[in-house]
Amino acid sequence: MSNFAMSALCRVFTRGAPCGLSSCSSVTGLRDFCSGVSRLDRAGSDSMRTASPVNLTYDVFDGKGDSTPLVFLHGLFGSKSNFHSIAKSLVQRTGRKVLTIDARNHGKSPHSPVLTYDTMTSDLTHLLGQLHIGKCVLIGHSMGGKVAMTTALSQPNLVERLVVVDISPSLTSAHTNFHAYIQAMKEVKIPSDIPRSTARRLAEDQLRKIVKERSVRQFLLTNLEEQNGQYGWRINLESISNHLEDILGFPEFDTTYEGPTLFLGGSSSAYISSDDYPEIQRLFPCADIQYIPDASHWIHADKPLDFISSIITFLQP
């Protein structure tokens, strides 16, 4: 039985890097649910350990303009809905078509035992081909940022511009104890046939022991789903757990992406540090690095207006 388990910017200060590298300063087998929350079945799940692309679920927000579409890629534990309000605003303000996509093992996309940047890039390019999108602006947050970078470096002709949100092309240090989050989610126990509000409260109470920040608990709880009275995590916790080192890492590249690139970090986040600048310059020689004040890792949630303004400014010729 297959399983389904869960932004004005401050002034920019030049760092003296190529192409204006700069930064700003100040600144988510049903069995006995009483013995643990299972990961409910997802139709279309992969049963083979294969690099074959899966058919990703996505939402389209149509704009009236003919400019290159924007494609949003969410982070670990996230889903396409994380960017819905951002997408709607960008459609209104730019006229561009905007897509938000669920990665494999996330949201409503199929489950697979394989979760690497190669496979996630393959999924994305497969979808773009299906939709006859020959070029796009890729905007990826965290894990999605690494998928966006991998795509730009391996298939640059597909990417007109690149926005990488609060992540770098390197090993992600243990800023967050993802292993503990996954284990805490696996250990959540919820009885069947109870109201969703009650189930959510019970799950949050159990997560609170490990996940101290309420905002993070609320984010993880967006993955709690009910089917036929049974509650489970829609993300594939097993695959995420098995591939966490792959997700925290980044593939090696000798190629570069020469297109316009924006690395957008939160000033209160440690995911893009000065230690990462040399590798960013090497792989993305025309990159700008900017920070949004008072924003954490979840920039788009903390400072949505600043986040949107940053993207619109970056899109201007």
UniProtKB/Swiss-Prot annotation:
Q: What is this protein called?
A: sn-1-specific diacylglycerol lipase ABHD11
Compartment annotation: Mitochondrion; Mitochondrion matrix
One GO biological process term: lipid metabolic process
- Origin: domain of life: Eukaryota
Describe the reaction catalysed, as an equation.
1-octadecanoyl-2-(5Z,8Z,11Z,14Z-eicosatetraenoyl)-sn-glycerol + H2O = 2-(5Z,8Z,11Z,14Z-eicosatetraenoyl)-glycerol + octadecanoate + H(+); a 1,2-diacyl-sn-glycerol + H2O = a 2-acylglycerol + a fatty acid + H(+); a 1,3-diacyl-sn-glycerol + H2O = a 1-acyl-sn-glycerol + a fatty acid + H(+); 1-octadecanoyl-2-(9Z-octadecenoyl)-sn-glycerol + H2O = 2-(9Z-octadecenoyl)-glycerol + octadecanoate + H(+)
First-level EC class: hydrolase
Query: What keywords would UniProt list here?
Result: Hydrolase, Mitochondrion, Transit peptide
Q: Which gene encodes it?
A: abhd11
Q: EC number(s) on record?
A: 3.1.1.116
The UniProt similarity line reads: Belongs to the AB hydrolase superfamily.
- What molecular function terms (GO) are annotated for this protein? carboxylic ester hydrolase activity; lipase activity
Q: Its function?
A: Catalyzes the hydrolysis of diacylglycerol in vitro and may function as a key regulator in lipid metabolism, namely by regulating the intracellular levels of diacylglycerol. 1,2-diacyl-sn-glycerols are the preferred substrate over 1,3-diacyl-sn-glycerols. The enzyme hydrolyzes stearate in preference to palmitate from the sn-1 position of 1,2-diacyl-sn-glycerols.
Q: Where is the transit peptide?
A: 1-20
Record's Gene3D superfamilies? alpha/beta hydrolase
